[in-house]
Amino acid sequence: MYAVIETGGKQFRVEEGKVLFVEKLDANVGDTVTIDKVLLVEKDGAVKVGTPVVDGAKALLKVVEHGKGEKIIVFKMKSKKNYRRKQGHRQPYTKVVVEAIQA
């Protein structure tokens, strides 16, 4: 059984026990988060596609940790004008494990 969920503006294919890195969720470590935006559910070979979400379906995610991603460097430069701007960014994320898919 698997499902496609949407969180943080991105879509993820999830199965029970799978570990995901999603955009930062407003939850503490150890909390269980319920995701109601389930776009697709596959169970015993039968695929149910939502319009846009599957009614009554939800995924339960357990928060494992919070962290920051790899640093990316944004560098702006204008040639011959001595204009240089360097800025770094680390996107916050939440590591979750899928506990259950209810459909």
From Swiss-Prot:
Keyword terms: Ribonucleoprotein, Ribosomal protein, RNA-binding, rRNA-binding
Species of provenance: Desulfitobacterium hafniense (strain Y51)
Name of this chain's protein: Large ribosomal subunit protein bL21
Gene: rplU
InterPro entries associated with the record: bL21-like (IPR028909), bL21-like_sf (IPR036164), Ribosomal_bL21 (IPR001787), Ribosomal_bL21_CS (IPR018258)
A GO molecular function held by the record: rRNA binding
Highest taxon above the source species: Bacteria
Chain's role: This protein binds to 23S rRNA in the presence of protein L20.
A GO cellular component annotation in the UniProt record: ribonucleoprotein complex
Similarity section: Belongs to the bacterial ribosomal protein bL21 family.
SUPFAM superfamilies named among the record's database cross-references: L21p-like
